[in-house]
Regions:
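Extended interfacial segments that mediate partner engagement and assembly in macromolecular machines
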Residues: 2, 16-116, 133, 147
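Core structural elements
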Residues: 50, 120-132
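Short, low-complexity Ser/Thr-rich regulatory SLiMs
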Residues: 63-65, 130-132, 362, 378
Length: 378
């Protein structure tokens, strides 16, 4: 694969495998999965992408002042030095175009970059989210609620990028590496962008957890639903449910779905997404997955299928013990880290479960990451 990224040699760190032919990338991922998981069950071939570039539907760029001019781009790996540019090979091309338009509009407003050492300036970051229809949500991250000229910015950006359907200001006053703060103001539009996965529509805001590769996420979710073998009669738990993506995709195939998520904003979004899709057989609980699962198991809840989609750190021994106590027919584990998946599958194995198969999907070409769906049965 030809390397045409201007920031690759400057080591932005976003695509460490870019110089490696895609076939070899998949082979490396397959070998790692086989080493970690092959002792439990067969590992299917990693399902790659036909076009493994420009797949990210989310972009995060930081602002800086360089040679007296406002610039934005990615950080050089391990630093807070901004590498200017809007031509990332991983981001959807509509996001690259939007990023260039955001910078032009910000310069026209004579806005300044936030200086983290002095604590001065207006702009910290911008976060962009795109939809399957090519619409974009733009979020500006500022240290202070006051953003003079915001109306002029919205007008200028909409003129340069008419596909932008909403502009949000996120306020992050903390001197930390966290990109987003907890407060937001909608400057234009609804404050979200609508996307579709597996026929289900989701509202995506700046802070929503949502898989960044739409094409491969559909592959991943369809495989998870296939392994669940839902017939319309099942009670399903979607643990670590986020904004409800897996659970709401499963709901038309199940009797009822219970989603569990500790982030209150995500639970609110999940409930709104259920209403948006007229899904009446799904409800969402704001609770820590481990604590809720343990309590529900103690109360005698016996779901037919449990979906586990934990963060990179994996699940917990207590959650796995609770799943075992619930005695579901199937557990479908969606993992973003093979090492923690291997650890958790070993924990299930000690409780008498058996991994039936591992189905890897490459959601992150040009990087070392890989997602895997695992079916566990007793």
């Amino acid at each position: 694969m030809p390397n045409t990224c201007v920031n690759y040699e400057k080591k932005c760190g976003g695509c460490p495998l870019l110089a490696l032919p895609y076939r070899e990338q998949l082979a490396k991922k397959q070998a790692r999965l086989q080493e970690l998981l092959g002792g439990f069950a067969p590992v299917k071939a990693v399902q790659g992408m036909a076009e493994p570039l420009h797949y990210r539907n989310k972009a995060i760029a930081s602002f800086a002042t360089q040679r007296g001019k406002l610039v934005c781009g990615l950080y050089a790996e391990g630093t807070h030095r901004v590498l200017p540019g809007a031509d990332c090979l991983l981001q959807e091309e509509i996001l690259n175009k939007t990023l260039a338009a955001v910078l032009d509009a910000a310069r026209a407003c004579r806005w300044t970059a936030y200086d983290e050492d002095r604590g001065t300036g207006l702009l910290r970051h911008t976060v962009l989210r795109s939809s399957c229809s090519g619409k974009v949500l733009v979020t500006l991250v500022t240290p202070d609620p006051d953003l003079p000229g915001s109306k002029n910015f919205c007008t200028a950006l909409r003129k340069k990028a008419p596909w932008v359907v909403s502009i949000v200001q996120n306020i992050n006053p903390t001197r930390s590496s966290a990109v987003l703060g907890s407060r937001e103001k909608t400057l234009y539009g609804p404050g979200f962008v609508l996307d579709t996965l597996c026929g289900t529509q989701f509202a995506i805001s700046s802070r929503s957890f949502y898989q960044v590769n739409r094409t491969q996420t559909e592959v991943l979710y369809k495989k998870a639903l296939e392994l669940a073998k839902l017939t319309g009669r099942e009670t399903v738990i979607d643990a670590y449910c986020g904004i409800g993506t897996i659970g709401l995709c499963a709901a038309p195939l199940a009797k009822q779905v219970i989603g569990v998520e500790r982030n209150p904003a995500a639970v609110k979004d999940a409930a709104a997404n259920a209403r948006r899709n007229k899904i009446a057989n799904a409800r969402f609980v704001c609770a820590d997955a481990t604590e809720w699962m343990a309590a529900a198991a103690g109360e005698g809840l016996h779901p037919d299928v449990v979906f586990l989609d934990p963060p990179r750190a994996g699940s917990t021994p207590e959650c796995i013990a609770a799943v075992n106590k619930m005695k579901p027919r199937r557990v479908v584990y969606v993992s973003c880290d093979p090492e923690t998946l291997a650890r958790d599958v070993a924990a299930f194995t000690r409780l008498g479960w058996r991994a039936s198969k591992f189905c890897p999907v490459d959601l992150f070409p040009q990087t070392r990451h890989v997602e895997t769906v695992c079916l566990l049965v007793k």
